[in-house]
UniProtKB/Swiss-Prot annotation:
This is Delta-like protein 1. GO terms for biological process: astrocyte development; auditory receptor cell fate commitment; cell fate determination; cell-cell signaling; cerebellar molecular layer formation; cerebellar Purkinje cell layer structural organization; clathrin-dependent endocytosis; compartment pattern specification. Glycans are attached at residue 476. Residues 1-17 form the signal peptide. The keyword Iron does not apply.
């Protein structure tokens, strides 16, 4: 049980240590000695066709993990091998494959994991009667057994060992070497030299990668750029290169690219344009220091920048001009007086005075007032420092008052006036249209009201203009406008002026105010008649007849209208102008012989004590409609008459005030007698008041037109 636990632990340890590695444990069998030809049980090896006690020997090798007590039993965790028959009794084994093609010396046990450094080795020498029978399970075949534990480091050197059991000797050697491209103590370091896109390196003794010249990095995939190439702004695909990233330039990619179009600027980062001193603008193309860049001022002048591309030169004495390029002629203003000659110097002048004068500008005279130097009445006074001074009268100037002053030299006269020098004064002779001492006033040409017929005058220089009212023209608006001026007549008509109007004389075949209409051709007989005389008698007669017919028609219409109005005029009021009414019946109406059942007097409210009973006459309003229709006040009449009475009522209905009772009887009859309703029915409108009032009344308002109705509340 303990052996199995140890075996399982060894297997797990081997798996845990397994990594991507590769190595080989090599065992070289060198010599085996079995002098007596005995088996392990001391029996003689028999069988086969050979001599007696001749042991045909083959080997079983078992390599396993380190065990303190080595067990020859499987499993062989690191590998196992069974050789062919290698010899009889005692024999030596050469290197390579010389004895049997199936056997190679040394015996190799490949590893796919890290070499642990320790191992257990079991080598058994076995006897077989037949080369084809290499079974190892039969203990009767065992000649000898070697079991050992060892520590072994990786290396090319062989470890020699000899095992003696008393009757047999076994000399052997072993080592552990790494496969190609594997390095390290456990052959766990893989390194394969390469020179492609995945690396450029060789391998050292311990498997470290050694980069080829010009390459760097963990796998030697990064080329070493040109020495000095900027690490951030440059890169390379091959050793010794220096390729610039976007925005950078130069051999070492350490120069930023300026903004396109930048002239006088620099950059710290790509696409910048930081202007140098004296330059400005988006592209640094605007000169802000013109003086420094162009030095425009000459002759030692001082230059001052005043803005973009502008400057000012402060000239030294004796020079002038925009750039101080012109030398000033100090003699130009003739500083020397009294006939002295001027000599121009670099920044000054010198006066050479005539005889009798001295001073810087020859302003001093050697003469005195005793010599009478002043002319034209000038007053002389001696100067304390020598010389004299002439005080000139009006109109004269000069050192000796020898120059006459021209009073007109200052052009005092305005508006083209001529100046006349009068000695001590001057006179301005004005142009036509101007006045005043200096001819500064424009004469008002509208003062005399030259514009006629209400025209508006506008003054100008020595002239005027008139704005004429409608109907007049001309310079003074005195000429009436010709109505024929704009040719108002058409079709070859002749225009004739008639005061403020015009008349068109039309050509034959045209008519209208402006002869703009084409007239139809007249009958031939009218043409012949018209040709007999120059005056158009036919047209005049036809016009007169039409006018007469129109007047007769108007008169007939007026007569018809008056007759119609007289026919519908109402008769005179039989009751007089002022009556007292009760229940819409006047006094004269109540006296009629009409039997009417009237509501009790206690229930009657007289609201119409006096009223003017009148109607609107048809003569005043021909299309008059009654304001109130005939009203039935719930009066129940006892008609004692017969149908003749009804017909009589019908005949008297047109009478205004006298027919009110009859109309009421007719309506009552039509109400009581359903079968004797007249042919023309009259619609009625009934209005009833509230029963809560003191006076209960019912109004039956007929739609029939009645012009004599007075409202009465019952």
């Amino acid at each position: 049980m303990g052996r199995r636990s140890a075996l399982a632990l060894a297997v797990v340890s081997a798996l845990l240590c397994q990594v991507w590695s590769s190595g080989v444990f090599e065992l070289k069998l060198q010599e085996f000695v079995n002098k007596k030809g005995l088996l392990g049980n001391r029996n003689c090896c028999r069988g086969g066709s050979g001599p007696p006690c001749a042991c045909r020997t083959f080997f079983r090798v078992c390599l396993k993990h380190y065990q303190a007590s080595v067990s020859p039993e499987p499993p062989c965790t690191y590998g196992s091998a069974v050789t062919a028959v290698l010899g009889v009794d005692s024999f030596s084994l050469p290197d390579g494959a010389g004895i049997d093609p199936a056997f190679s010396n040394p015996i190799r046990f490949p590893f796919g994991f890290t070499w642990p450094g320790t191992f257990s080795l079991i080598i058994e020498a076995l006897h077989t009667d037949s080369p084809d029978d290499l079974a190892t399970e039969n203990p009767e075949r065992l000649i000898s057994r070697l079991t050992t534990q060892r520590h072994l480091t990786v290396g090319e050197e062989w470890s020699q060992d000899l095992h003696s059991s008393g009757r047999t000797d076994l000399r052997y050697s072993y080592r552990f070497v790494c496969d190609e491209h594997y390095y390290g103590e456990g052959c766990s370091v893989f390194c394969r030299p390469r020179d492609d896109a995945f690396g450029h390196f060789t391998c050292g003794e311990r498997g470290e990668k050694m980069c080829d010249p010009g390459w760097k990095g963990q796998y030697c995939t990064d080329p070493i750029c040109l020495p000095g190439c900027d690490d951030q702004h440059g890169y390379c695909d091959k050793p010794g290169e220096c390729k610039c990233r976007v925005g950078w330039q130069g051999r070492y990619c350490d120069e930023c690219i300026r903004y396109p179009g930048c002239l006088h600027g620099t950059c710290q980062q790509p696409w910048q344009c930081n202007c140098q001193e004296g330059w400005g603008g988006l592209f640094c193309n605007q000169d802000l220091n013109y003086c420094t860049h162009h030095k425009p001022c000459r002759n030692g002048a001082t230059c001052t920048n005043t803005g973009q591309g502008s400057y000012t030169c402060s000239c030294r004495p004796g020079y002038t001009g925009a750039n101080c390029e012109l030398e000033v002629d100090e003699c130009a203003p003739s500083p020397c007086r009294n006939g002295g000659s001027c000599t121009d110097l670099e920044d000054s002048y010198s006066c050479t005075c005539p005889p009798g004068f001295y001073g810087k500008v020859c302003e001093l005279s050697a003469m005195t007032c005793a010599d009478g130097p002043c002319f034209n009445g000038g007053r002389c006074s001696d100067n304390p420092d020598g010389g004299y001074t002439c005080h000139c009268p009006a109109g004269f100037s000069g050192f000796n008052c020898e120059k006459k002053i021209d009073l007109c030299s200052s052009s005092p006269c305005s508006n083209g006036a001529k100046c006349v020098d009068l000695g001590n004064s001057y006179l301005c002779r004005c142009q036509t249209g101007f006045s005043g001492r200096y001819c500064e006033d424009n004469v008002d040409d509208c003062a005399s009201s030259p514009c006629a017929n209400g025209g508006t005058c506008r003054d100008s220089v020595n002239d005027f203009s008139c704005t004429c009212p409608p109907g007049y023209t001309g310079r003074n608006c005195s000429a009436p406008v010709s109505r024929c001026e704009h040719a108002p007549c058409h079709n070859g008509a002749t225009c004739h002026q008639r005061g403020q109007r015009y008349m068109c004389e039309c050509a034959q075949g045209y008519g209208g105010a402006n002869c703009q209409f084409l007239l139809p051709e007249p009958p031939p007989d009218l043409i012949v008649a018209a040709q007999g005389g120059s005056f158009p008698w036919v047209a005049v007669c036809a016009g007169v007849v039409l006018v007469l017919l129109l007047l007769l028609g108007c008169a007939a219409v007026v007569v018809c209208v008056r007759l119609k109005l007289q026919k519908h005029q109402p008769p005179p009021d039989p009751c007089g102008g002022e009556t007292e009414t009760m229940n819409n019946l006047a006094n004269c109406q109540r006296e009629k012989d009409v039997s009417v059942s009237i509501i009790g007097a206690t229930q009657i409210k007289n609201t119409n004590k006096k009223a003017d009973f009148h109607g609107d006459h048809g003569a005043d309003k021909s299309s008059f409609k009654a304001r109130y229709p005939t009203v039935d006040y719930n009066l129940i009449r006892d008609l004692k008459g017969d149908e003749a009475t009804v017909r009589d009522a019908h005949s008297k209905r047109d009478t205004k005030c006298q027919s009110q009772g009859s109309v009421g009887e007719e309506k009552s009859t039509s109400t009581l007698r359903g079968g004797e309703v007249p042919d023309r029915k009259r619609p009625e409108s009934v209005y009833s008041t509230s029963k809560d009032t003191k006076y209960q009344s019912v109004y039956v308002l007929s739609a029939e037109k009645d012009e004599c109705v007075i409202a009465t509340e019952v």
